[in-house]
Amino acid sequence: MTSSRVENSSSRAARKVKLALMGPAFVAAIGYIDPGNFATNIQAGASFGYQLLWVVVWANLMAMLIQVLSAKLGIATGKNLAEQIRDHYPRPVVWFYWVQAEIIAMATDLAEFIGAAIGFKLVLGVSLLQGAVLTGVATFLILMLQRRGQKPLEKVIGGLLLFVAVAYVVELIFSQPALAPLTKGLVIPTLPNGEAVFLAAGVLGATIMPHVIYLHSSLTQHLHGGTRKERYNATRWDVAIAMTIAGFVNLAMMATAAAAFHFNGHTGVADLDQAYRTLEPLLSHAAATIFGLSLVAAGLSSTVVGTLAGQVVMQGFIRFHIPLWFRRAVTMLPSFVVILLGLDPTRILVMSQVLLSFGIALALVPLLIFTSNAQLMGDLVNTRWVRVTGWVIVAIVVSLNGWLIVGSLLGVA
């Protein structure tokens, strides 16, 4: 009897430790459903139906492994990826890494901020500039939670992630995608033409996010409670749950666009405003409103995460710290410039996702090197299959980027 009570008590304690350690992956996962994903997935679904769903599946599986490695680095070493690069690489390389990481973070934030502004515009009927002002105010308010510690922010961002997921369950109900072709698109790889490869690279850039590779290792480097092994096991569950939700949302975005647009003859839908206007008569006003609200939720939460990632990058690489409010104010400026110049915001979103894919390999290579170093990682060092899989992912990313460069120069993509 006593033995049974002790076992139950230790089991409850283990569950409490696991629950207490959950959260960082939900912050990282929000970067995987930002407005850039909306733009890229809608364009891919409208243009090619279900044919590129398999790209989302494989990109999400890659992202799961990458986020586990990033989180593991923080747990094993007590330092984030940027700090490890600073400690192990020559100063010129560190400065190069810092500059490119800041550019990637700014490109990401541009997509996220403008996406939220578009969402406010669609839902409230305000101008894009007014939507940008609302986005700025809302993100400042969310960032204020950071003063109370990491957990309150994790809960708010996790709640927004779940809201977007529920919103897309509703969108799937409205759009009613055909199961047979959807299943075929999930499991059979196909790239019909050069535009499909360009969009596939965009989907990859939208799904695997360089800035959250840096951020996740920072979120786990100060985790407390349980043994190191318990923290790692809890983190794997955290990543599995959060990234499964993010993967579902990305698949649902593309499937909804395919069902609502592609198979109703609207194959040219590549604009978030156009998607909203087209959804209303095709499905319903409610479906269009839910789309707009999910865009706001994704944009606000992901732009907050982008601001945090930028802070981690600066502190990690060059040991320089600026207040979060100042960073938020500075990184809003490119978005306002794009809006005031009247540039096509959706085109900016899609191009930013392609740009992001160029930063993936630069973050992945040192991550793989460090997590494969037994002296650094101890018993959490990568196994052989993880190392091989990681380098295959790097090869795929570099190959896609090479094709993009050649294709763009030759006018193929």
From Swiss-Prot:
Transferase listed as a keyword: no
Ranges annotated as spanning the membrane: 19-39, 46-66, 94-114, 122-142, 156-176, 196-216, 241-261, 290-310, 329-349, 350-370, 392-412
Membrane topology field: Multi-pass membrane protein
Protein keywords: Cell inner membrane, Cell membrane, Ion transport, Membrane, Symport, Transmembrane, Transmembrane helix, Transport
Gene Ontology molecular function: cadmium ion transmembrane transporter activity; manganese ion transmembrane transporter activity; metal ion binding; symporter activity
Keyword Ion transport applies: yes
One Gene Ontology CC term in the entry: plasma membrane
Origin: domain of life: Bacteria
GO biological process entries: iron ion transmembrane transport
UniProt-annotated location(s): Cell inner membrane
Residues spanning the signal sequence: none
Family stated for the protein in its record: Belongs to the NRAMP family.
General function of this protein: H(+)-stimulated, divalent metal cation uptake system.
Protein name: Divalent metal cation transporter MntH
Organism for this UniProt entry: Klebsiella pneumoniae (strain 342)
